[in-house]
Curated annotation (Swiss-Prot):
Taxonomic source organism: Francisella philomiragia subsp. philomiragia (strain ATCC 25017 / CCUG 19701 / FSC 153 / O#319-036)
GO CC annotation: cytosol
Gene3D superfamilies the record matches: Anticodon-binding domain, Bira Bifunctional Protein, Domain 2, YbaK/aminoacyl-tRNA synthetase-associated domain
PANTHER family xref list: MITOCHONDRIAL RIBOSOME PROTEIN L39/PROLYL-TRNA LIGASE FAMILY MEMBER, PROLINE--TRNA LIGASE
Alphabetical keyword list: Aminoacyl-tRNA synthetase, ATP-binding, Cytoplasm, Ligase, Nucleotide-binding, Protein biosynthesis
GO-annotated molecular function: aminoacyl-tRNA deacylase activity; ATP binding; proline-tRNA ligase activity
Name by which UniProt lists this protein: Proline--tRNA ligase
EC number: 6.1.1.15
Job description of the protein: Catalyzes the attachment of proline to tRNA(Pro) in a two-step reaction: proline is first activated by ATP to form Pro-AMP and then transferred to the acceptor end of tRNA(Pro). As ProRS can inadvertently accommodate and process non-cognate amino acids such as alanine and cysteine, to avoid such errors it has two additional distinct editing activities against alanine. One activity is designated as 'pretransfer' editing and involves the tRNA(Pro)-independent hydrolysis of activated Ala-AMP.
CDD domains per record: ProRS-INS (cd04334), ProRS_anticodon_short (cd00861), ProRS_core_prok (cd00779)
Amino acid sequence: MKATQTLIATTKELPKEAVLTSHQYMLKAGLIKKLASGIYTWMPIGLKVLQKIQNIVREEMNKAGASELLLPSVLPSELLQETHRWDKFGPELLKLKDRHERDFCYGPTHEEPIVDMARDTIKSYKQLPLNLYQIQTKFRDEIRPRFGVMRAREFIMKDAYSFHENSECLHNTYNKMHETYCNILDKIGLVYRPVRADTGAIGGDNSHEFQVLANAGEDIICYSNGSDYAANIELATYAKPDLSTRAVSENTITKIHTPNIKTIEKLCTELDFDIKKTIKTMVIKDAKGNFFALVIRGDHELNETKINKLEQIVAPYTLATKDEIFSIFNANPGSLGIVNCPVQIIADYSAMMIEDICCGANEDDYHFTNVNWGRDITSYQIADIRNVVTGDISPDNNGTLELTNGIEVGHIFELEDVYSKPMNANIIGQDGKSKPMLMGCYGFGVSRVMAAAIEQSHDENGIIWPETIAPYQVAILPINYNKSESVKQTADKLYQELLVKGIDVILDDRGARPGVMFADADLIGFSHHVVIGDRLLEQGLVEYKNRKTQEKQEIRLEKLFDILA
């Protein structure tokens, strides 16, 4: 491609609304252009990167035995009403009416239309398993779209849906998709981790997220430094301590006056307590109106997902109000504790390992010290109810846990019959009986992974693409292209030779100043730069620069082909 034949729309201005580096660079490099909040035009060079990602996704999905199709982007309300998602989806669902006043929506996801197609065409177990995928534009009316294509209202996604007769078959395909997603991200060239994830409202036994590691990631993931264990913060757990090893204290429980001390931080600062010897007591109310006291170490945080999964608690739970707490404890938040607690106590394992605890006395302006489990509190239950922290022992007892930020670019689920059952997508099984098909679903954020790649690899000058998705592998940057015949001839000849070899190349024939060409090449992220000028040509040389390493060298043109090989 010649630069004059495409649209290079770089700008020096830093958009005010762009916070993330990926958003800033995608706008500055002219890869996207904002049309409305959370809606972007894909400019030619940005689209080229997007298409390279799509090609990798297609290649690996096809290798895995999946077949591509394309579902409508506008969906009739009747389909989503069958699964009750027409109302459940809420304001993120963009609803519209046609001229006949019939209700439609712009597809935020495509479970219902794929099941509708399947129930009309798949009748027997003999047609299964079947894995179908599409690469489709979707729309979710986010209340606050931000971060560019990372959290846009309109986005491009690969979604696949598999159909099965039994759980074993479903699990086999799930594992195949797990492997396929790893292959996709390996081929793109990203540093990532597959992590176990909460199945949420979808249910089922298996769910994995694919997280690209980046400081700008909104998700917190944890992994073991001694094994392949990895999970997101919602699901991550730790090796349970042996409670029998807890030290037995002979110190006497003591009540101390603590006026105006309502937080753990103030307690530790003013009275010089070790925060790891304190506990937090938080009161919740479950869906049936039952109250519980949740107890964690003072430096830990509650995990909402784990709490909602406890057998004792009817989800969803809410935090008890100040009035509710006072009516039960005759004390206010900040003074609550575990001695003579009037509601059922559920304590985290780490809280159970503390001896000589400092906690609220269930009396305003007072705390207890030297509180010990078993002696001072005899009625309690134990559960994992907190977020893991760096240094926790991995649940497989191999290594310790570390935390990092990630950008979720893929998510796979075993749906089972969550959609097929309410939509009557049945088949005749091997036993001759009718039953719902089992399903898996596998989402991959095609446009999001592009932003994730930038977050993971950039410098102060611009984007450093993994070479497999760089818009152009080689940029020819001729100085005085329109003035020097020798420069023009050399540049044109090299351009044709690279095209013949199948190398993705762009020739900057705009006649721009050298500084502009170099800055644009760095900003957009062309992988290899070849600078052609009269001075070096007189010696039979050109300047070569590797965008990733910033290494420059003066080489003969024939050596360039060795570098690119």
